[in-house]
Structures are given as structure tokens and as C-alpha cells.
Amino acid sequence: MGTITVVINEGPILLIRALHRATTNKKMFRSTVWRRFASTGEIAKAKLDEFLIYHKTDAKLKPFIYRPKNAQILLTKDIRDPKTREPLQPRPPVKPLSKQTLNDFIYSVEPNSTELLDWFKEWTGTSIRKRAIWTYISPIHVQKMLTASFFKIGKYAHMVGLLYGIEHKFLKAQNPSVFDIEHFFNTNIMCALHRNRLKDYKDAEIAQRKLQVAWKKVLNRKNNTGLANILVATLGRQIGFTPELTGLQPVDISLPDIPNSSSGAELKDLLSKYEGIYLIARTLLDIDQHNAQYLELQEFIRQYQNALSESSDPYDTHLKALGLLETPPPQESTEKEEK
């Protein structure tokens, strides 16, 4: 009887173990298949979502949710989220999130989609006390979001308006660097130059007001490259007015070098890092031939194009994408202005 009892009692136990192994293997199989076929953008979005969930999770609950050794506690005890009252489920440990992850997601968003805008609203809708969320965003991220929104995705005015409205949050979260001259302001003016040409805008009063609003939002006014001065002067010639910006000091143009010795991953990183400067330099020469006097622009363009080798030219690609947008660049009136 003892042997039979053991066999009978172990039967369900062995069955449960087998089912657990099968379920685990099935989940692993699904995960492997998903990783194999998911796009770079989908993988990046999943990592961003997991990072956000982790940092929004109550600190007292993280040890139970994210430590594998505590997973069984969640499975055997009725531990619930104090806010949603939903049963807590174990989650894999969160790995450090690279800056490239957000770049990959930005590049993946389809034209005329609100996906990037919706994601950024959710990300910046968190408490400023969640510093890791706010400090993850870099000036280059802001530049790429603005550039992608204008040339490829659309919803540019909405993205600008969102940024204008949350500037104070980044300041309180101790990440004012995202509102700088080199990435935020210069990209804003670059897009304005293209927008004015496309829409044939010539209203000097509106242009001056828009310029002042953009300048007011700049928290880091280190004018390292001197591109801001050329951009503002080009805007003035394009519209026909004399721009006035208090605090924008004259600076000699100084652009980075792309060494010939760079190759592989290092070269790829440099091309991504300086893509914004390249777009601005090409824009300045494309919009106004007066800027051909700046030999530094031409030299930087030469170096960048040499480094591209046979890769597609990002400026040409961006202009082509802009032409393919189903809707024209947003009207000025939809931008959120703060005086």
C-alpha cells in the first residue's frame, strides 16, 4: 500500500512538473521565435516598455517581481499590485538600456503614425522623481525625434508642442541638457527653413515670434559649433527680416572631424552622432547659396560623405521621405507657443 500510495500521490506531482516544463519550454520557444522574427524597432520598443515598467514599479515590490529566486513566492502567494489589485507576475531582470535602443525605435516608426508621439507622451507622463526615466533622454534623442517627425513620420508640430510643454519637467528632473542649442534649437531652425520653403512662408512677424519662442526654451546655451548663428542669419534672409536674439553671441564655426582611420562600429557611431550636423550643413547650402562662403561646411560634408562610402546619403533620404508623406508638414498655427 505504501508503494501504491507514493505512486498515486506522485502522479499528479510528476504531471504538474511535466506541464510546468512543457509550459516553460513553450514560452521559451515562443520567445526564441519572437526574437528571431521581430524587427529591430519592435525589439527596441519592447526594451523601452520594460524599462519604463520597471522604473514605474513600486520599489518595495521590485524584489518580488524581478528577482528570479522570489518568483515562486509570487506564484504561491496572492501578492497583488496595491494600485491595480492585479496579481503580480514574475518578470525577467531588467538590463541596462543603451541609448541606441531609442534611436532604433525612432527609425522604425512608420509615416503618418502617432506611435512616437504617443510613446513620448507616456514616457514623459511619469513623475519627475523617476530620474532614470527622465535622464535617459539625451540631446541626440531629441534631435532625432524632431528630425524624424518632420521629414519622415509627420506630427512635427505636435512633437514641438509637446517638447515646449514639458521643458520645465526636464529642468526639475535635472536633465536640462536636452534643450540645448546644438541639437534642440538648431534642429528646430533647420526644420523651419525647410518648412518655409515648402509652404512659401514670408511673414516676418510670425517668423520672429517663432524664433523667440524656440530660443526661450533653450536651457543649455553653449554654442559650440557656431551653426546657430548661421541658421538664424539664413532664416532672416529667407523671410526678409533681421533676427534679434538676446544672448546668442557671435561664434566662429567649428565642426568636428571624422578621422579617416575610423572604421567598423566606431565609424557607425560617429555617423549617427554627427548625422544632425550633416543634415544642418546640407540644409544651409541647399537653402541659401550665400552659405557657400563657409568652407567649414563644405569640408565637413566632404568628410561625412567619404565616411558614408556606398551607404545612402541621409540628407537625400530625408528629403525623399518628406516628399512621400501623405500630408504636408503641419501648419504653424498648431504649434504650442509660450511667450
Swiss-Prot record:
Its main location: mitochondrion. Residues 1-37 form a transit peptide. CDD domains: mS44 (cd23704). One of its GO terms (cellular component) is mitochondrial small ribosomal subunit. One of its GO terms (molecular function) is structural constituent of ribosome. It comes from the Eukaryota. It is found in: Mitochondrion. GO terms for biological process: mitochondrial translation. Component of the mitochondrial ribosome (mitoribosome), a dedicated translation machinery responsible for the synthesis of mitochondrial genome-encoded proteins, including at least some of the essential transmembrane subunits of the mitochondrial respiratory chain. The mitoribosomes are attached to the mitochondrial inner membrane and translation products are cotranslationally integrated into the membrane. Belongs to the mitochondrion-specific ribosomal protein mS27 family. Present with 16000 molecules/cell in log phase SD medium. Component of the mitochondrial small ribosomal subunit (mt-SSU). Mature yeast 74S mitochondrial ribosomes consist of a small (37S) and a large (54S) subunit. The 37S small subunit contains a 15S ribosomal RNA (15S mt-rRNA) and 34 different proteins. The 54S large subunit contains a 21S rRNA (21S mt-rRNA) and 46 different proteins. This is Small ribosomal subunit protein mS27. It comes from Saccharomyces cerevisiae (strain ATCC 204508 / S288c). The gene is MRP13.
